[in-house]
Amino acid sequence: MQILTCDGQNEGMMRQMAQLLVDAFREHWPEAWRTLEEGMEEVREMLEAERICRVALDEDGSLLGMIGGIPQYDGNVWELHPLAVQPHVHGRGIGRMLVLDFETQVRQRGGLTITLGTDD
Protein backbone atom coordinates (compact mmCIF):
# COMPACT_ATOMS: atom_id res chain seq x y z
CA MET A 1 0.00 0.00 0.00
CA GLN A 2 1.13 3.53 -0.69
CA ILE A 3 -0.29 6.88 0.41
CA LEU A 4 -0.05 9.70 -2.11
CA THR A 5 -1.31 13.21 -2.69
CA CYS A 6 -4.27 13.30 -5.05
CA ASP A 7 -3.81 16.09 -7.56
CA GLY A 8 -7.06 15.77 -9.51
CA GLN A 9 -5.33 14.83 -12.77
CA ASN A 10 -6.88 11.35 -12.88
CA GLU A 11 -10.63 11.47 -13.54
CA GLY A 12 -10.94 7.75 -12.87
CA MET A 13 -9.40 8.16 -9.42
CA MET A 14 -11.73 11.06 -8.67
CA ARG A 15 -14.72 8.86 -9.57
CA GLN A 16 -13.38 6.08 -7.31
CA MET A 17 -13.09 8.62 -4.49
CA ALA A 18 -16.63 9.88 -5.05
CA GLN A 19 -18.00 6.33 -5.08
CA LEU A 20 -16.08 5.55 -1.89
CA LEU A 21 -17.81 8.45 -0.12
CA VAL A 22 -21.20 7.11 -1.18
CA ASP A 23 -20.37 3.51 -0.22
CA ALA A 24 -18.49 4.15 3.02
CA PHE A 25 -21.14 6.42 4.53
CA ARG A 26 -24.26 4.67 3.20
CA GLU A 27 -24.92 2.53 6.29
CA HIS A 28 -24.29 4.99 9.13
CA TRP A 29 -24.88 8.39 7.51
CA PRO A 30 -26.87 7.78 4.31
CA GLU A 31 -27.74 11.44 3.78
CA ALA A 32 -24.06 12.45 3.59
CA TRP A 33 -23.31 11.67 -0.06
CA ARG A 34 -26.28 9.93 -1.66
CA THR A 35 -25.16 10.03 -5.28
CA LEU A 36 -21.98 9.86 -7.29
CA GLU A 37 -22.45 13.52 -8.27
CA GLU A 38 -22.67 14.59 -4.61
CA GLY A 39 -19.50 12.59 -4.00
CA MET A 40 -17.79 14.27 -6.97
CA GLU A 41 -18.70 17.69 -5.59
CA GLU A 42 -16.98 16.81 -2.31
CA VAL A 43 -13.93 15.43 -4.13
CA ARG A 44 -13.61 18.66 -6.14
CA GLU A 45 -13.66 20.62 -2.88
CA MET A 46 -11.03 18.29 -1.40
CA LEU A 47 -8.74 19.12 -4.34
CA GLU A 48 -8.70 22.87 -3.70
CA ALA A 49 -5.10 24.09 -3.55
CA GLU A 50 -5.00 24.96 0.15
CA ARG A 51 -6.41 21.61 1.28
CA ILE A 52 -4.84 18.26 2.00
CA CYS A 53 -6.08 15.35 -0.11
CA ARG A 54 -4.35 11.98 0.33
CA VAL A 55 -5.27 8.55 -1.01
CA ALA A 56 -4.23 5.04 -0.02
CA LEU A 57 -3.72 2.77 -3.02
CA ASP A 58 -3.08 -0.95 -3.27
CA GLU A 59 -0.34 -2.48 -5.45
CA ASP A 60 -2.63 -2.30 -8.49
CA GLY A 61 -3.43 1.38 -7.97
CA SER A 62 -6.96 0.76 -6.72
CA LEU A 63 -8.31 3.08 -4.05
CA LEU A 64 -8.36 1.65 -0.52
CA GLY A 65 -9.09 4.85 1.39
CA MET A 66 -8.75 8.60 1.48
CA ILE A 67 -8.39 11.48 3.88
CA GLY A 68 -8.82 15.21 3.52
CA GLY A 69 -8.00 18.30 5.50
CA ILE A 70 -9.28 21.86 5.60
CA PRO A 71 -6.99 24.62 6.93
CA GLN A 72 -8.38 26.99 9.53
CA TYR A 73 -6.90 29.88 11.52
CA ASP A 74 -4.19 30.61 8.96
CA GLY A 75 -3.18 26.95 8.78
CA ASN A 76 -2.50 26.59 12.49
CA VAL A 77 -5.55 24.32 12.83
CA TRP A 78 -6.67 21.64 10.38
CA GLU A 79 -10.06 19.98 10.25
CA LEU A 80 -9.84 16.32 9.27
CA HIS A 81 -12.59 15.94 6.65
CA PRO A 82 -13.39 13.42 5.31
CA LEU A 83 -11.87 10.04 6.15
CA ALA A 84 -13.19 7.01 4.28
CA VAL A 85 -11.96 3.45 3.82
CA GLN A 86 -13.38 0.84 1.46
CA PRO A 87 -15.78 -1.31 3.50
CA HIS A 88 -14.18 -4.56 2.28
CA VAL A 89 -10.80 -3.61 3.84
CA HIS A 90 -12.04 -2.37 7.22
CA GLY A 91 -9.98 -3.61 10.15
CA ARG A 92 -6.66 -3.69 8.28
CA GLY A 93 -5.25 -0.46 9.71
CA ILE A 94 -5.70 1.63 6.57
CA GLY A 95 -7.62 4.37 8.37
CA ARG A 96 -4.95 4.47 11.07
CA MET A 97 -2.18 4.82 8.47
CA LEU A 98 -4.10 7.58 6.70
CA VAL A 99 -4.50 9.50 9.97
CA LEU A 100 -0.79 9.11 10.81
CA ASP A 101 0.09 10.35 7.32
CA PHE A 102 -2.36 13.24 7.74
CA GLU A 103 -0.65 14.24 10.99
CA THR A 104 2.67 14.37 9.12
CA GLN A 105 1.15 16.46 6.32
CA VAL A 106 -0.30 18.94 8.83
CA ARG A 107 3.00 19.19 10.70
CA GLN A 108 4.88 19.83 7.43
CA ARG A 109 2.51 22.73 6.74
CA GLY A 110 3.11 24.26 10.17
CA GLY A 111 -0.17 23.09 11.66
CA LEU A 112 -0.41 22.78 15.43
CA THR A 113 -3.84 21.24 15.98
CA ILE A 114 -6.16 18.80 14.21
CA THR A 115 -9.90 18.89 14.80
CA LEU A 116 -12.61 16.43 13.93
CA GLY A 117 -16.05 17.98 13.67
CA THR A 118 -19.24 16.17 14.59
CA ASP A 119 -21.79 18.79 13.56
CA ASP A 120 -22.46 17.58 9.99
Language model feature labels by segment:
Residues 1-3:
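Extreme N-terminal starter segment of soluble prokaryotic enzymes
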Residues 83-90, 119-120:
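A short, internal acetyl-CoA/4′-phosphopantetheine-binding micro-motif in the GNAT/acyltransferase core
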Residues 93:
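Glycine-rich phosphate-binding loop
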Residues 96:
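Residues forming the Rossmann-fold NAD(P)(H) cofactor-binding site
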Residues 106-120:
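Conserved GNAT acetyl-CoA-binding A-motif
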